[in-house]
Amino acid sequence: MSSAVSASPQAASPQQDRTSGLSARYARALYELADERKQLDEVVSEMAALGRLFAEDPSLRRLIASRSIDAREAGRAMEQVLASQGVSDLVRNFIGTAIANRRLADLPSLVAGFAVYVAEKRGVVAADIASAHPLTDTQRAQLTARLAEAGYGRVTIRETVDPSLLGGLTVRIGSKLYDTSLKSRLQRLRHVMKGAA
């Protein structure tokens, strides 16, 4: 576990940087408006529910990813989804603005960006952990302790299982990626062996 924090961070790709900047702008605008209207807790809860919905509903992911759907059709479809979730006018307007600005495909990253922005404002750091197998409670506690030692005091861990990693894990905090997966180790070994041949 200790190597997860001591590995060299890798920079985010230009696409991630663009999306992160976009997400941050949208997140800041929604946060400030929700705070001003004294609806922050409600909006945080609704955006978290939308994030779970985007992650769990394959038909919604297909709608979002489709390049062939007209913005008006997408807006109507998303309005139905939002109505079924009972979200506030503030969140409806936020999603509607994103769609009107041709950001339908970016909705999951905008929702995730809002969660990151809220966590930062509250002094909590989000760590995205991908592992080949689900983490045990002991591993989770060790990882949290190692992250605290590395200067990430209050950490919220978001876990995903990615069998393609083969073993080990990756930890992404902001734009830093700590990769101790067996997959990346094998790729580095393959690269070194090609250079020696």
Swiss-Prot record:
SUPFAM superfamilies from the UniProt entry: N-terminal domain of the delta subunit of the F1F0-ATP synthase (SSF47928)
Protein's membrane topology: Peripheral membrane protein
GO CC, alphabetical: plasma membrane; proton-transporting ATP synthase complex
One Gene Ontology MF term: proton-transporting ATP synthase activity, rotational mechanism
Low complexity: compositionally biased ranges: 1-16
Function: F(1)F(0) ATP synthase produces ATP from ADP in the presence of a proton or sodium gradient. F-type ATPases consist of two structural domains, F(1) containing the extramembraneous catalytic core and F(0) containing the membrane proton channel, linked together by a central stalk and a peripheral stalk. During catalysis, ATP synthesis in the catalytic domain of F(1) is coupled via a rotary mechanism of the central stalk subunits to proton translocation.
Record's subunit section: F-type ATPases have 2 components, F(1) - the catalytic core - and F(0) - the membrane proton channel. F(1) has five subunits: alpha(3), beta(3), gamma(1), delta(1), epsilon(1). F(0) has three main subunits: a(1), b(2) and c(10-14). The alpha and beta chains form an alternating ring which encloses part of the gamma chain. F(1) is attached to F(0) by a central stalk formed by the gamma and epsilon chains, while a peripheral stalk is formed by the delta and b chains.
The protein, known as: ATP synthase subunit delta
Organism: Acidiphilium cryptum (strain JF-5)
Gene symbol of the encoding locus: atpH
